[in-house]
Amino acid sequence: MSLINIHNASLSFSNLQILEKSTFHINKNERVCLIGKNGAGKSTLLKIINKKQDLDEGQIIYKKNTTTAYLEQNNPKNLNISIYDFIALGLKEHEKNKKKHTNEIVKIEKIIELIKLNKNTLLSHLSGGLLRKVALGRVLVREPDILLLDEPTNHLDMKTIKWLETFLKKFSGSILFVSHDRNFIQNVSTRIIDLDRGKLVSWPGDYENFIKLKNESYRIEKIQKQLFDKNLEKEEQWIRKGIKARSTRNEGRVKKLKILQKEQKDYKKIEKINNIEINQSKNYLGKIIFKLDNIDFLVNNKIIIKNFSSIIQHGDKLALIGDNGCGKSTLIKIIIGENKPQKGKIYIGKGLKISYFDQNRSFLNPNKSIIENIDYGKEKILLNSREQHIIRYLKNFLFKPNQLKSLVKTLSGGECNRLLLAQLFLKPSNVLILDEPTNDLDLDTLQLLEKIIIAYKGTVIIVSHDKTFIKNTAKKCWFFEKNGFINTHFSQYDSLKKEKNNFHKEKIQKNKSKINLAIKIKNNFKKELNAILYEIETIELDIKTLQKKVNEPDFFKKTLEEKLPTLKMLAQKERKLGKKILFWEKLEKNIINTKI
């Protein structure tokens, strides 16, 4: 039996249909990714499963004694509490009587050890990424059968995302998570459920396979809709000509027409953002946009940036990459003049028009409407010297005319980011600065944003932890190391292996007195590296074969005894792969640190 079964579920808010006679299930040991457009109802579905939202119709059946734990999309707001006490609140017994039983203390200490943070630290002292990690700890302490995670990678840096991927793969229960991080989905999910226009559709396989199948289904749907429209038009022409004789055949045709007209009325068209322009300014002078000479920046005597020099040229597509709190947003503020360095000089090019996407959404007024947040609510806007009605412009960002007077504070995270992009793209610019633009955006909007950045003729500076987004947009990377050092890499971000290799490349110092010995040691490491890479490739092939079996449509219909050997073997191979990768990383580090 499945852990959870949802049957014929329907739910609507005002005119928005969230679920329409939808059915799906979650089996034991599944890691299911819930995908859908912004505002489709993904977070609502998690709340339904967590018993925080009722259905209008249908039923949800839980296997006896099944427990759930829910990680919300937003970080905690009450920050005047220690990490220990916050995680302890995840235990229902602790919430009821506040008694710290030995068993509870062991559970809490175990989670704190897992997230590797000081239990006495107040939440108010943590970054957004660390708050996310602590919120996850509060969920995990309950040891649920099903983890419900809403955008778990938001605010997390690459290192923490990798930690989360590893943890979730080892998690003994089932997971239903919402995410738009394509690399994370590809690495973690065993199945994908798509919430599309009120319907829940289960897709076998991984994310890349899902995209192929989804695009094909859209193509087929469009063809079917064209044939439907032609048939409807034909029947309506027939009825307009008048019915000459009352006959059973004619009555049947009239009934058929009414059915077709109802289907036409009920049809929900595919909504995609596909017609967005950006207001590009051409009034720039010279090739150099920003020049940084020997920049030092400290906060409370802590070195954030040390002796950094570089040049940003016109047309650069630059990504800033590093852990949370390493100074990426600080450097952006130095570049645009909001922060002054303690040492060094900054040259800013002439004629620059900068559009800045702020991850905190500080440019949106939450107490004003959608339309009031765009060009002061003017009826007509100017886009690349062409006048356009504000309603038409916002329609391109999937905002319907009847919702334009809605206050910004009522919007979802993804809708806020779409509005911020609408605001940003209207402002004439030749420099785009995007600080965490991918948070909460659905996959269609992400892919369109990538196309806009690629086609943009000006300069783009990106801060993001989304590997796929960086790989698809950036042509140049700055890697933030410890102690304020920044390494520049003048080519595309490709993979984590390449990142790690290039991240440390400039550290290698040549030592002529020990060169022969160093070369010999390095060659030995390389031989070991080649051997371990072969083992990794072999294990990955085994995992791929096993995953194909697991992703077969009938696999989860088998009995537990039939499924268990395959699932156990897959888990063993994944654990083995993890160990081999750790050994590979150690060898790479040895090679990098061997000075020649």
Swiss-Prot record:
One of its GO terms (biological process) is DNA repair. Residues 1-222, 290-516 form the ABC transporter domain. Its main location: cytoplasm. This is ATP-binding protein Uup. SUPFAM superfamilies: P-loop containing nucleoside triphosphate hydrolases. Keywords: ATP-binding, Cytoplasm, DNA damage, DNA repair, DNA-binding, Hydrolase, Nucleotide-binding, Repeat. ATP 1 binds at G36, K37, N38, G39, A40, G41, K42, S43. The keyword DNA repair applies. HAMAP family: Uup (MF_00848). It is found in: Cytoplasm. PANTHER family: ABC TRANSPORTER ATP-BINDING SUBUNIT, ABC TRANSPORTER DOMAIN-CONTAINING PROTEIN. ATP 2 binds at G322, D323, N324, G325, C326, G327, K328, S329. SMART domains: AAA. One of its GO terms (cellular component) is cytoplasm. Belongs to the ABC transporter superfamily. ABCF family. Uup subfamily. It holds the Pfam family ABC_tran_Xtn. The C-terminal domain (CTD) helps bind DNA. Its EC number is 3.6.1.-. It comes from Buchnera aphidicola subsp. Acyrthosiphon pisum (strain APS). It comes from the Bacteria. InterPro entries: AAA+_ATPase, ABC_tran_Xtn, ABC_transporter-like_ATP-bd, ABC_transporter-like_CS, ABCF_ATPase, P-loop_NTPase, Uup. It catalyses: ATP + H2O = ADP + phosphate + H(+). Transmembrane segments: none annotated. Residues 519-596 are annotated as: C-terminal domain (CTD), binds DNA. Probably plays a role in ribosome assembly or function. May be involved in resolution of branched DNA intermediates that result from template switching in postreplication gaps. Binds DNA and has ATPase activity. GO terms for molecular function: ATP binding; ATP hydrolysis activity; DNA binding; ribosome binding.
